UniProtKB/Swiss-Prot annotation:
It comes from Streptobacillus moniliformis (strain ATCC 14647 / DSM 12112 / NCTC 10651 / 9901). Belongs to the Rho family. Transmembrane segments: none annotated. This is Transcription termination factor Rho. Gene3D superfamilies: Nucleic acid-binding proteins (2.40.50.140), P-loop containing nucleotide triphosphate hydrolases (3.40.50.300). It comes from the Bacteria. Pfam families: ATP-synt_ab, Rho_RNA_bind. GO terms for biological process: DNA-templated transcription termination. Facilitates transcription termination by a mechanism that involves Rho binding to the nascent RNA, activation of Rho's RNA-dependent ATPase activity, and release of the mRNA from the DNA template. Residues 51-121 form the Rho RNA-BD domain.
Amino acid sequence: MENITLDELGNFTLTNLRKLAKEHKIEGYSTIPKMELLNRLCYSIATAEGLIYSYGELDIINETYGFLRNTPQNIDVYVSNSQIKKFGLRQGDVIVGEVRKPLNDEKNFGLLKLIYVNGEKGELSRQRPIFDDLTPSYPIERLELGEGTVSSRIIDLIAPIGKGQRGLIVAPPKAGKTTILSDLANDILKYNKDVQVWIILIDERPEEVTDIKENVKNAEIFAATFDENTSVHLSVTEKVLEAAKREIEKGNNIVILMDSLTRLARSYNIEMPSSGKLLSGGIDPKSLYMPKKFLGAARKIRGGGSLTILATALIETGSRMDEVIFEEFKGTGNMELVLDRALQQLRLFPAVDILKSGTRKEELLYSKREFDSILKLRKFLLKLNEAEALKFLMDLIKRYSSNKDLLENIDYELKL
């Protein structure tokens, strides 16, 4: 492909972009999302032509000027207030364009010519809808997990996840939440090609971050470990949320898996100025505002994309603060997956408390025939205790290759 201008790249299909990426020897081109591939190609082609191009996430300072962060050159690129207003730029936008070197006493490179915003031509950015003006609705399309791992299939039957779901994974220590999140991420990516998966790890151990990165290959992973300042925890979360909103405005489907909402609330409790009021456990009610705003951003947009958020909430940690945080978030989601450490101690994995887990308006996510079969299964499981119910369901799942086959044979299995 000869004599291609950077302005023309935006019209290329993903297949043609990959062919071009192969010519430019871009590593991993076959698995890179289209927007990221477009950005890398612009940078590669411009560099080959002797131009200075860059791309990065827009970080707007005090609602005036901004900087492109996380650029390939590891520099911050200044974006003027006039450029932000002209193109209607927003926090978290991914921008690619020509940049110039610092002039005179300037400290930073400057954005000279804006080419693309979030993978689309810059002049179209002003026409985007605003996230908060979009109409939310109940999730009506289920994420396909029915042929995945045992843990994903249990979730698909007991607490189905729709596009736009706002879910809590209620987890005591050592109940296997990290493994469940890894399985979920891999199965969502494998069986739902129109969905991007982002994982946020807040206040986690560094080795757990490494483990997630090694086990979940095609997800975007954002991490702030426990040895980093709490301000970093807040910054990472807020930037990811803004970037997700930009994707939803384009009509895309994003799934965010977060571990953990409890630790995020702790970090806000440290960083937020005191309101002079304290809840039991020493937590300032003001510090819960932003974590609630984060979880509340999950929604299905009527006639558009969706933002699905599944976040872990820690219980039985011995901390009164953690219990208060959980109580404050209880009921804010429309899906709950409850893990039980006693089940894990019985070597039952996933340690899902089937009787306490569920999804609101789940009938919207199943066909009528599927929902009738689910009701029969649930009524049967209610007659058993937690361990018996989980063991029965796991054995049932292992006899069928998919949940669809299982539900079609539910009358036979329950001897109805």
